[in-house]
Amino acid sequence: MANQKLPTLKYTGKSESAVPIVSESELQTVTAEPWVKISDKGLQLEGLNFNREGQLFLLDVFEGNIFKVNPATKEVTTKFQSVKDNPAAIKVHKDGRLFICYLGDFKTTGGIFATTEKGEQIEEIISDLNTEYCIDDMVFDSKGGFYFTDFRGYSTQPLGGVYYVDPDFKTVTPIIQNISVANGIALSTDEKVLWVTETTTNRLHRIALEDDGVTIAPFGATIPYYFTGHEGPDSCCIDSNDNLYVAMYGQGRVLVFNKRGYPIGQILMPGRDDGKMLRTTHPQFIPGTNQLIICTNDIENHSEGGSMLYTVNGFAKGYESYQFQ
């Protein structure tokens, strides 16, 4: 029989939230506003990237649809369906092609293919037949080569890593290995620092590179931040001040770090305390502005809110990466 006179824990304050914020509760915080609804269904949206004309491309992982959004009209069109299973990211090449990372069977059949904006002229860049990668994301450097993340493993089996592919797409060089589900990746404006999120161990990696872009500088691989809560850090992007924006999957928010890896702000999805719109996956800036777009979905809330793009203004304008240079 319960003793009503004993001190009793109660759900008040932070403990009332489905996803309480504890260690970052004093950060500058803003709540995002709805921008575009992609679907009434709960789709695993990912891969936000703009082309040179300012059109936004994104995808849904599990059904493989590639979407285009016109920011001026907010019109959403489905352009094509991925020829590979579980696409996870889109990056636009300077020549206009879409480079699409895919996870395959989530074990050994991931890769990257390039295609036109209509899904034509497919070219294998990293083949799922000749490798064992499970590729989640990539980022181009100014030479036209790129870094990619290998999404394999889990918390006690760190099979993933980060690799660099030369501009001719023929040579793959390991940068850092033994990572548990390497996920988001971003490159600093001077291309000297590589940021990587490690999802299932809740870690942020900051990797200082030497001039060749593949050698880690002495004492250059550090972990400046450990995240808390379920599930963990996902895709990320930088602004022109080298601040890093990291989507927190399963938490309905984006954390912002300065160039040294210190947290300086956060962006919340509406309804997150009630368990809504928690699957925040990817932030990306509208070119030439400080307006940040964030994709998320409501799958964990029985897809009640569908799949959405939200928006806020960031600390600075977005950095215009390879496709704009």
UniProtKB/Swiss-Prot annotation:
Exhibits lactonase activity. Acts in cells with perturbed membrane integrity and is possibly related to the membrane homeostasis. It is found in: Cytoplasm. Its EC number is 3.1.1.-. It comes from Staphylococcus epidermidis (strain ATCC 35984 / DSM 28319 / BCRC 17069 / CCUG 31568 / BM 3577 / RP62A). The gene is drp35. Transmembrane segments: none annotated. The active site is at D234 (proton donor). Keywords: Calcium, Cytoplasm, Hydrolase, Metal-binding. This is Lactonase drp35. Belongs to the SMP-30/CGR1 family. GO terms for cellular component: cytoplasm. PANTHER family: LACTONASE DRP35, LIPOPROTEIN-RELATED. It comes from the Bacteria.
